[in-house]
From Swiss-Prot:
Homodimer. The modification N6-carboxylysine is found at K124. This is Dihydroxy-acid dehydratase. The active site is at S517 (proton acceptor). GO terms for molecular function: 2 iron, 2 sulfur cluster binding; dihydroxy-acid dehydratase activity; magnesium ion binding. Pathway: Amino-acid biosynthesis; L-isoleucine biosynthesis; L-isoleucine from 2-oxobutanoate: step 3/4; Amino-acid biosynthesis; L-valine biosynthesis; L-valine from pyruvate: step 3/4. Keywords: 2Fe-2S, Amino-acid biosynthesis, Branched-chain amino acid biosynthesis, Iron, Iron-sulfur, Lyase, Magnesium, Metal-binding. The keyword Transcription does not apply. Its EC number is 4.2.1.9.
Length: 616
């Protein structure tokens, strides 16, 4: 039977100094011997998805203490990708994921904590904490801050829903008046919470449900709604039960690697494809799988993408539905229920509540449950009041959206598309693959061939797009923006948004070894692997080269002979120590980012650090 990790610091005469310090934090004799549970918070005033988390750690801690544990809270950093977007700040976003994972490991191992409750929400924070949880493999429950309410405003005598992306597009559209742009800006992000569409933050918080590491409702229940408080109260109680199950009953099923096993990862990716989640989730699931020592690769994702339909369509792929609408339609369990009926899920998995997938669906799928409390929870809706306070309203929809023929969530028979919302493309352009969010691609451009316009930084591409140098039919290529080449693998939300602003959203393609915001839509292909800085073919492309994209056949090709590609590769190698670097880019790269780049792998590996370079 495993010994409590915390006993290392709380038992034995030689630990008198450690106990003296624990006493200085408020612990007493009766606490020594109880499980010490880390409350891993990520409160910050920089990020709307985290601005309301300050008191929620205390809420969880109180429940831990009341249930027989000792709670000790600490904070991680949290970068707001939207605020960091479009300037040098975006270089720091993806590297912050590794820092978060490491900082959780450092704190938990340095102080010998026995278990964790992870209070996350936004883009890199949930993945970073997930990586740490699977690396440490001690009992854990995730409870996120919840989605933001959708913005709303009146334009042309019509009430429309809004989000961050609308503000960005209208702000760059020369045809939009200053007054209208200002109106949209002021209405787009009305409350605390993670941005209201199926962007990266909400996608990842939905996936923690599918992985079994969070409770039903975690991915979709609004940050502002009073019902969400119960998730935090339950997490504090449940983590003590899980902790005692492992340490006192030798029950390894309480450990995250036994909950989030390969079958659960396949279910999570199946959900992601069905709901048209952010392409960033591919990056993060690959990284998390490596931490869990699970053999889950781009090949697995490719296989799933070929058989899973799209059953849910949410902003940015449509403005009709946001996360509040997904919740009304049954949330993650609503989508999983339809996937289960279609025979597309592994059923022999459990979650942190100890329920199997069939048991969870029986209780929480709104189309089958008899539990009125569950139905009431899924009617939790927006209040439409600007606020930064969690649990500040208790509005409810009059009815649930259980229309699986024409509602937000569809059955297999009425799927938005028989092809799922994400696809992996291969070809001489991307030998190790690249990712496209097909949910956001118009049917008219699923096949696209055009001449390349090549840029070696996001900034140059934006200048060209806004300057009218990119025209209908072009394929914009932005390279040396991968994990190593950026460094940091910037998101390309501004270039894709500005293509829309210029009326080119359905007339051009954009390809990059960088990545895209969950707010991106259009023919936007990212994660090209190998990246330019690692010798990828994307580094060899020249202006005017023809690129052929064929999403239905999962192909992306540079239409050059093998001999010409080989000649260009030889010329690149002849540059010596300048090979596989940008020719004309001026970019200040800090020591911290250079350190990250020195170990970074390409996106097909999850952009994790190359352990082979560390030895041992």
């Amino acid at each position: 039977m495993p010994k409590y990790r915390s006993a290392t610091t709380t038992h034995g005469r030689n630990m008198a100094g450690a106990r003296a310090l624990w006493r200085a934090t408020g612990m007493t004799d009766s606490d020594f011997g109880k499980p010490i549970i880390a409350v891993v918070n990520s409160f910050t005033q920089f990020v709307p998805g985290h601005v309301h988390l300050r008191d929620l750690g205390k809420l969880v801690a109180e429940q831990i203490e009341a249930s027989g544990g000792v709670a000790k809270e600490f904070n991680t950093i949290a970068v707001d990708d939207g605020i960091a977007m479009g300037h040098g700040g975006m270089l720091y976003s993806l590297p912050s994921r590794e820092l978060i994972a490491d900082s959780v490991e450092y704190m938990v191992n340095a102080h010998c904590a026995d278990a964790m409750v992870c209070i996350s929400n936004c883009d890199k924070i949930t993945p970073g904490m997930l990586m740490a949880s699977l690396r440490l493999n001690i009992p854990v429950i995730f409870v996120s801050g919840g989605p933001m309410e959708a913005g709303k405003t009146k334009l042309s005598d019509q009430i429309i829903k809004l989000d961050l992306v609308d503000a960005m597009i209208q702000g760059a559209d020369p045809k939009v008046s200053d007054d209208q742009s200002n109106q949209v800006e002021r209405s787009a992000c009305p409350t605390c919470g993670s941005c209201s569409g199926m962007f990266t933050a909400n996608s990842m918080n939905c996936l923690t449900e599918a992985l079994g590491l969070s409770q039903p409702g975690n991915g979709s229940l609004l940050a502002t709604h009073a019902d969400r408080k119960q998730l935090f109260l339950n997490a504090g109680k449940r983590i003590v039960e899980l902790t005692k199950r492992y340490y006192e009953q030798d029950d390894e099923s309480a450990l995250p690697r036994n909950i989030a096993n390969k079958a659960a990862f396949e279910n999570a990716m199946t959900l992601d494809i069905a709901m048209g989640g952010s392409t960033n989730t591919v990056l993060h699931l690959l990284a998390a799988a490596q931490e869990a020592e699970i053999d889950f690769t781009m090949s697995d994702i490719d296989k799933l993408s070929r058989k899973v339909p799209q059953l849910c369509k949410v902003a940015p792929s449509t403005q009709k539905y946001h996360m509040e609408d997904v919740h009304r339609a049954g949330g993650v369990l609503g989508i999983l229920g339809e996937l289960d009926r279609a025979g597309l899920l592994n059923r022999n998995v459990k979650n942190v509540l100890g329920l199997t997938l069939p048991q969870t669906l029986e209780q929480y799928d709104i189309t089958v449950t008899q539990d009125e409390a569950v139905k009431k929870m899924f009617r939790a809706g927006p209040a439409g009041i600007r606020t930064t306070q969690a649990f500040s309203q208790d509005c409810r929809w009059d009815s649930l959206d259980d229309d699986r023929a024409a509602g937000c969530i569809r059955s297999l028979e009425y799927a938005y598309s028989k092809d799922g919302g994400l696809a992996v493309l291969y070809g001489n352009f991307a030998e190790n693959g690249c990712i496209v969010k097909t949910a956001g691609v118009d049917d008219s451009i699923l096949k696209f061939t055009g001449p390349a316009k090549v840029y070696e930084s996001q900034d140059d591409a934006v200048e060209a797009i806004l300057g009218g140098k990119v025209v209908e039919g072009d394929v914009v290529v932005i390279r040396y923006e991968g994990p190593k080449g950026g460094p940091g693998m910037q998101e390309m939300l501004y270039p894709t948004s500005f293509l829309k602003s210029m009326g080119l959203g359905k007339a051009c393609a954009l390809i990059t070894d960088g990545r895209f915001s969950g707010g991106t839509s259009g023919l936007s292909i990212g994660h090209v692997s190998p990246e330019a800085a690692s010798g990828g073919t994307i580094a060899l492309i020249e202006d005017g080269d023809t690129i052929a994209i064929d999403i239905p056949n999962r192909s992306i090709q540079l239409q050059l002979s093998e001999a010409e590609i080989a000649a260009r590769r030889e010329a690149q190698e002849a540059r010596g120590d300048k090979a596989w670097t940008p020719k004309n880019r001026q970019r200040q790269v800090s020591f911290a980012l250079r350190a990250y780049a020195s170990l970074a792998t390409s996106a097909d590996k999850g952009a994790v650090r190359d352990k082979s370079k560390l030895g041992g």
